[in-house]
């Protein structure tokens, strides 16, 4: 059987505990009660969680809205009006409180296995990460970094960037996926 997770029906989600950052973890009751949980998906760079895949199958994947909201607000600065927290950024898995919180929530469920695809620019399989839910995912992030990362000799004064057109730039959030990497390549005061 295939089920759609309902993040808003608290009768279908159960409390497992709290993360180190105070996020109350409510997950889909069916997953919590399952004999085995296998995480599936794909690993891609992610604006705030560093990379997609792995623990994101649990949070936000099968988490209640309260859990998701508590986690996602960590992408913002602690200062009102401060914008995005610079430690929650693209391709960063260490000291990234959004990602760390997702890992804490996933550890409470403790999935038995992970299978995540890594795709190439044409949408074909490039590699598969499989094994322990954290270790295999982390190795997959290294593969994605080698496959998609670009080393710059120096920061630039100007960067030209494009999301690639619709649907990759259909709203501000999607458009940021082109803006953020360009901003990472700029000198202080540089122009996109």
Describe the function of each predicted region:
Residues 25-34, 46-50, 102-106, 146-151, ...:
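A generic local secondary-structure boundary/capping motif
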Residues 40, 46-49, 60, 67-70, ...:
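Short helix/loop capping segments that flank catalytic or ligand/cofactor-binding pockets
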Residues 2-4, 59-75:
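Short, acidic/small-residue loops that bind anionic groups at enzyme active sites
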Residues 1-52:
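An acidic, phosphate/nucleotide-engaging active-site surface
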Residues 83-166:
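Membrane-embedded hairpin module used as a gating/binding unit in multi-pass transport
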Residues 68-91:
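A gly/proline- and charged-residue-enriched helix-loop-helix capping module
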Residues 169-192:
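C-terminal catalytic subdomain
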């Amino acid at each position: 059987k295939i089920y759609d997770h309902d993040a808003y029906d608290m009768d279908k989600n159960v409390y497992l505990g709290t993360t180190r950052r105070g996020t109350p973890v409510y997950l889909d009751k069916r997953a919590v009660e399952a004999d085995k949980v296998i995480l599936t998906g794909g690993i891609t760079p992610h604006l705030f969680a560093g990379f997609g895949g792995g623990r994101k199958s649990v949070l936000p994947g099968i988490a209640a809205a309260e859990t998701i909201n508590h986690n996602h607000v960590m992408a913002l600065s602690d200062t009102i009006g401060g914008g995005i927290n610079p430690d929650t950024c693209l391709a960063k898995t260490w000291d990234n409180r959004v990602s760390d919180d997702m890992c804490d929530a996933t550890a409470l469920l403790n999935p038995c296995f992970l299978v995540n695809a890594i795709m190439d620019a044409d949408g074909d399989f490039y590699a598969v990460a499989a094994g322990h839910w954290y270790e295999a995912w982390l190795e997959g992030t290294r593969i994605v970094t080698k496959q998609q990362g670009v080393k710059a000799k120096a920061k630039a004064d100007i960067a030209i960037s494009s999301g690639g057109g619709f649907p990759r730039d259909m709203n501000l959030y999607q458009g940021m996926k082109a803006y953020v990497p360009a901003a990472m390549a700029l000198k202080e005061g540089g122009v996109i």
